[in-house]
Amino acid sequence: MEREEEKRVSTLQQSFHHSKEPTFLINQAVLFGESHSSFLPEIERDNRGEKIKTNPRKNRPGTVILSKQSSRRIMSGSQPRPPVIPSRRPGFRVCYICGREFGSQSLGIHEPQCLEKWRVENSKLPKHLRRPEPSKPPPFSGSGSYSLQAANEAAFQSSQAQLLPCETCGRTFLPDRLLVHQRSCKQKVEGPRAPSLDRSDDLAGLKKVSSGITTRPRTVICYICGREFGTLSLPIHEPKCLEKWKVENDRLPREFRQPLPQKPQPLLTGQPKHAGPRQGQLVSCPNCSQTFAPDRLPVHQRSCKAQPSGPKVQDLTLGSRGGLKESTNPKPQRNMAAPPVTDKPKMIRRPPTIVCYICGREYGTKSIAIHEPQCLKKWHNENNLLPKELRRPEPKKPEVRTITAKGFYDLDALNEAAWTSAQSQLVPCNICGRTFLPDRLIVHQRSCKPKVAK
């Protein structure tokens, strides 16, 4: 009986050992089996009790080895939201010149290079856009994140102080970028009204703007060339511009020479009046009536040709009796300060085009002869790639018939015949009936499906 009991205990120990369960369960299982075994002698129980008493260090009743599942349950129960420690961001510092962030070690290398770059770019700007050199904010005596944040805020404000507002839209830019922006920034038509100097509320608004933001100095228009200059630059520019105007005016033909432009009187309302003399110097073209500067008119007349008209139109003026009489002035007035007033509206004649009989597109009279051989060669290549049932016969060029006694082609009839020839190559789709070029019909038929009758 004792041997059987020992075998049973040894098998229990092996099974618990292989299952990797807590070790204290083995003793409980053994004790549980001993408590229910009525046939074991009392001496054996006493001996086991002595073994437990004699070896108290080997058995650790206070420690428990937990499995992975039980440990997760206990941790989730005791700590439902474990604390998350964020990774500490390194202390970045803001450059007081450009406003970008750099590491504490990199900032000492960056600032001298950034200041040198700032000086180079500032020296390239016009004088009225140049800014004073930015000053580095004083270091803060405190320590910790508060002093770092205050230093970065002061550096950022120093970099933002260099921005200049656009006079048109009010947005702020760096001085070198403001010039680029002003090329494309145009004032809105329905913008706010311009403040007049007579109203007290407008004067108060101007004082607020001038006290808050440093605006770009106003520009004045040159009465000779019409360009804008600063108030200090204009007195230097005007004598040079007038000298240049005299040289160019002397080179012109006599009928195009203009009188010396007179400087307008200074007015409080200022700038719009300066453009008056510049507009008065413009000369109109006798062919198209457009106005140009005198030196630009000969350049324009090289390409501007009078519109061909059939019968010569006589210059008719109203007589005293209400009838029409022919003008007695044989010479056309070429030196006109304003365009002539005519009852007929200006008609811009489109250059004549010819339709290609192969592709149906329009080309100029010179380009069509270059295009047609290339288009026909391309047509042959594409036609050979088609299936045999979709190949078309070669398109024929329509006959060109000249009108008797005039010697030029009837372009309308020629284009109509070429368009008909190009349209005859289209093939209808057998499903929807739409017409396509043969190479496009194959692509269309992949997605064309018959409509399902309702």
Curated annotation (Swiss-Prot):
A zinc finger (C2HC/C3H-type) spans 91-120, 162-191, 218-247, 281-310, 352-381, 425-454. Its cofactor is Zn(2+). Residues 48-85, 125-146, 256-282, 299-345 are annotated as: Disordered. It comes from the Eukaryota. Zn(2+) 2 binds at C166, C169, H181, C185. Zn(2+) 1 binds at C95, C98, H110, C114. Transmembrane segments: none annotated. Zn(2+) 6 binds at C429, C432, H444, C448. Zn(2+) 4 binds at C285, C288, H300, C304. This is Zinc finger protein 474. It comes from Bos taurus. The gene is ZNF474.
